[in-house]
Amino acid sequence: MIKEAQDLAAAAFGADHTFFSIQGTSGAIMTMVMSVCGPGDKILVPRNVHKSVMSAIIFSGAKPIFMHPEIDPKLGISHGITIQSVKKALEEHSDAKGLLVINPTYFGFAADLEQIVQLAHSYDIPVLVDEAHGVHIHFHDELPMSAMQAGADMAATSV
């Protein structure tokens, strides 16, 4: 029954596979990070990542390479990372084992995920997406592109 439900969820989200997590999105995010990083490995992450990302980095022994998101000057909230910040990070750390993107951010801002995925893949770097606040975006054409639609390698969503 669980496998059937996971298969149905994968089909709904356009994913090859879906695995349910009893630890919520935090557990899934930690699994994603620890599946690509080991001791001393670099992972590119936005500075405003969820604490589960930092926990996974600590547990795996990886080294975070921070990309600073744009900050809204009027509201003081973070928008997300840009293609330019990702490009700079990839040029300086082409040996990174992964790139993590928040899509959408905790304030609802979406990255140009398709371009970011294409750029990271040109460096043979997998893209992991924290999509905890974007489970709905896959299901409407007028919403930003979901991680799976953009070609990301893994995504953690919350239902």
Which positions does each model-derived feature cover?
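Conserved PLP-enzyme active-site core in the AAT-like
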Residues: 11-12, 27-159
